[in-house]
Amino acid sequence: DRQVYVGLPDIKGREEILKVHARKKPLAEDVSLSDIAKATAGFTGADLENLLNEAALLAARGGQRFISMADLHEAMMKVIAGPEKKSRVVPPHAKRLTAYHEAGHAVVIHELETQDPVHQITIIPRGGAGGMTISLPQEDRSYMSRRELEEHIAVCLGGRVAEQLVLGDISTGASSDIQKASSIARNMVTKYGMSEKLGTIAYTSESNEVFIGRTMAQARSYSEEVAGLIDEEVKSIVDTAYRRCEDILSQRRSQLELTAQYLLAHEVMSGETFQKVFTDPDDEVFEGLIPAES
């Protein structure tokens, strides 16, 4: 049978899809579907429909006649990360660890030019995560450069480095971050030809799956020596990113502390407030917060 591939909608397509699904929904004057379209790169048509339906439910539950921009932003977070789990009781030590972990991600993002700006930081559990740092793409991307990938690995490791730097210990909370960092590094080496030692060669097919009738030994098409070099290169990429995180967070320790203290006090931090950590740390929003380097 003939198969037709339908790609993800671009920014114009997303805005048109949003308009279609918003036709019979009352929108407040502050709503900008154009802004929502910009913030939803990677969303499918179904995701966008779900976003508007969730926003309508939020407005109804709040007794509002119109869907506000705040409703749409919360609905977007729900689509991305799942619903908030405010009923979950988080012990103080776990809350503190999560605050520094997420602050670590955010500060590293801020310091790396290729990364998308922070949209929101939260230590309220969502889905299976204890906290989350959301950065939204400013444009649609069809590819990523080596520098972008290297810096994205650093972002993944920012939480783990912050734990070690501030708390003097590490936790299992960074498990998914480490898996993601390792996966990106391995793809750089084996799929994207971004290793100087191994050259512009792909060591994996489009799918790494082992099919029926094909053994694990047959699935690998390179020698033990090359496998060892791949592991060395992956480790080198991840280790370099880790050291970069250490440098960033050591130099930006006061910003790391202020971000974490704000999260402990308020649980959620907007991208605008996070920017003030760097541009206006004496702003009244931080009043009463004493970043104690401990």
Residue ranges and their predicted role:
Residues 5-73, 78, 82-83, 156-164, ...:
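Conserved C-terminal "switch" segment of AAA+ ATPases
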Residues 10, 32, 44, 68, ...:
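Helix N-cap and loop-to-helix transition residues
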Residues 24, 77, 86-87, 208-209, ...:
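Intrinsically disordered, low-complexity regions
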Residues 47, 104-105:
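Short hydrophobic/aromatic residue motifs in ordered secondary structure
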Residues 80-92:
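Peri-catalytic and regulatory segments of divalent metal-dependent proteins
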Residues 93-100, 106-294:
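Soluble catalytic regions of large protease machineries
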